Regions:
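A glycine/serine/threonine-rich, flexible loop-to-helix segment
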Residues: 1, 46-50, 175, 182-210, ...
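Alpha-helical segment proximal to the catalytic Tyr-Lys
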Residues: 129, 171-175, 234
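Conserved glycine-rich cofactor-binding loop
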Residues: 16-18
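Active-site helix of classical SDR
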Residues: 124, 158-159, 166
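Short C-terminal tail/terminal secondary-structure segment
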Residues: 212, 225-226, 237-250
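Substrate-binding pocket helix/loop in short-chain dehydrogenase/reductase
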Residues: 100-101, 108-113, 202-206
Length: 250
């Protein structure tokens, strides 16, 4: 499949590991130029960059807290200096909140809102003027299954908020040659932070409820992101792509 992505500039937030890393590698195979960001582990981010460079991609890495509008603006300006602009934005940075609703704190709520909604808001505002000027752009956000079937009020709220945000941008900027879509991954085989669900519990739940009884793979999500960004998907906007092994149907 000819993606038409050669030479495009991709900005991926939360790119140090897991789906972010897999997405970066998928774009590296398409001869794109890549800007990778994370707010914490520069070492892991540099490892992702090195893997992309081995595939022939030109890569730059930056520490960026997506909840800080000034840092986001500086990151996009750095991308302009290095590569001339940003053609594709992948809002992969996320913050998850686990546990019963009444055991969560207001700080948990605000943190989830900041990363999952403020982050895409700031990054989109920073890249859209350049996309409008060039008449071409792709913005890809991350929602999740909880937005559609429940499963944690805080998580469901922010993930459904991403869907609304995506649709609003798609409606407004389609006339400028910009598509905006979101992805709702199911249970993906990733390195999990301490305190999140135990792997064995997740595997049992997936095996019991999912028609394709296994975890999804980060590379499968990365391949979907590349497709959504490609010329082949130029007439698709405002949609949420569910990649969940059939865990639920839309």
């Amino acid at each position: 499949m000819k993606t038409g992505l050669s030479g495009k500039v991709v900005l991926i937030t939360g790119a140090s590991r897991n789906i972010g890393r897999a997405t970066a590698l998928a774009f590296a195979e398409e001869d794109t130029r890549i800007v990778l960001t994370t707010r914490r582990s520069k070492e892991s981010l540099d490892a992702t960059a090195a893997a992309c460079a081995e595939l022939g991609a030109k890569v730059t890495t930056l520490l960026c807290d997506v909840t800080d509008e000034d840092q986001v603006g500086s990151t996009v300006e750095a991308a302009k200096r290095e590569f001339g602009g940003v053609d594709i934005l992948v809002n992969n940075a996320t913050q998850r909140v686990q546990g019963p609703f009444l055991k969560q704190s207001p700080e948990d709520w605000r943190g989830a809102m900041a990363v999952n909604l403020d982050g895409p808001y700031y990054t989109s505002r920073a890249v859209l003027p350049g996309m409008i000027e060039s008449g071409w752009g792709r913005i890809i956000n991350y929602s999740g299954g909880s937005a559609f079937r429940g499963g944690g009020a805080t998580k469901a709220a922010v993930k459904l908020g991403v869907v609304g945000f995506t649709r609003g941008l798609a409606r407004e900027f389609g006339k400028n040659g910009i598509t905006v879509n979101s992805i709702a991954p199911g249970t993906i085989e990733v390195e999990r932070d301490p305190g999140l669900e135990r792997e064995a519990d997740l595997k049992g739940a997936v095996d019991a409820s999912t028609p394709i009884p296994r975890f999804g793979r980060p590379g499968e999500v990365g391949a979907l992101v590349v497709y959504i960004a490609s010329d082949q998907a130029a007439y698709i906007t405002g949609q949420t792509f569910h990649i969940n092994g059939g865990d639920y149907f839309q």
